[in-house]
Curated annotation (Swiss-Prot):
Belongs to the SepCysS family. It catalyses: O-phospho-L-seryl-tRNA(Cys) + hydrogen sulfide + H(+) = L-cysteinyl-tRNA(Cys) + phosphate. Coiled coil: none annotated. This is O-phospho-L-seryl-tRNA:Cys-tRNA synthase 1. Homodimer. Interacts with SepRS. Its EC number is 2.5.1.73.
Amino acid sequence: MNCGEGIDSRQIDELFINLDPIQAGGRLTTDAMKAVLAYGDGYSVCDHCTKPFRLDHISKPPLAEFHRDLASFLNMDVARLVPGARRGFQAVASAMVKPGDPVLLTAYSHYTEFLSVEQSKGTAFEIPADESHIITPDAAAARIEEVIKTTGKTPALMFIEQVDYQYGNQHPVSDLSKVAHQYDIPVLCNGAYTIGIMDVNGKELGADFLVGSGHKSMAAPAPSGVLATTSEWAEKVFRTTGIKGDLTGRTFGVKEVEMMGCTLMGVTSVGMMASFPHVKRRVKEFDAQVQYVNRIVDALLTIEGTKVQSEYPRKHTLTRMNTTDSFDTVAKTHKKKGFFLTSALRERGIAGILPGSTRVWKFNSYGITSEQADYIAESFIEIAEKEGLVCSR
């Protein structure tokens, strides 16, 4: 089946167990797929948009209620839909950072966090990670003191990853927030890999701003995401327009400046909303998903020379492995070179690991079943033994 001239249909999740690091949490639910068909036309949610003409006030489909439910789900006061987590970072930086302001990020901050600071003409300062690839409160405090001493300014904002994209490690956001707040620095918690995957309580984390990704972790079409904040900061980050045309005298009602007015006007918002009941249920099952990924990692570690670079035992399904001393030794003489591993996995119905990777690579097992976890674990061992690697199972 083709989707149009030259566009093949995509069947990766129908034909394979997909371990792609960034795709696992964004697989659509059946309800979201129905929403894609029903609301695929451009401004499809605008059929019943009436005064004050803003997305978060639309009652049919129930987007106004969805905005309130999202805020409650995250234990924050106000939430808005945004076109991906990056637009949440951008909105907060635009509201909080002035030219020349120092801004704290971490050694594992996503590039879009840096770009949001750059666009606001702030200056980026990174908090280093420790040897375990964790951002610690002590490191944050030391970096804050250093930045204040060298710039003469208190950082305008601190970005913290709840789970980072490089190692899939959980960082002590609550403790980091306490450190930042001692210096009156507001905190943006990046929950791109957690919101929609596991329970996230923004106020318990001490987050002033909480950003999530719909298409990465909330079973939603791309680009979609959420930006939530507390009542303390809502008026600032969701400020309404005050501009006026000098010739026409036009004004623009209650459009929010950092949101650029309405954000997700069609299939993205309804797809995200359609998946939401499923998302609320699945975050309660995250512990089982962690058990499954640990089964896979345990199996990989029986292959001599294999190391896990993420914290272990795993606390999240996104995982970074180092097989330089195992699978990469095979790649040096194999006729398929580094592609032998992903080729062998694909023959077994497993996809998603970067083709050619036999040294350092990531996978994300979120959404698999217990049986699939056992199958993946056994597949890695079978491939290793077939290629002459020693396994201690």
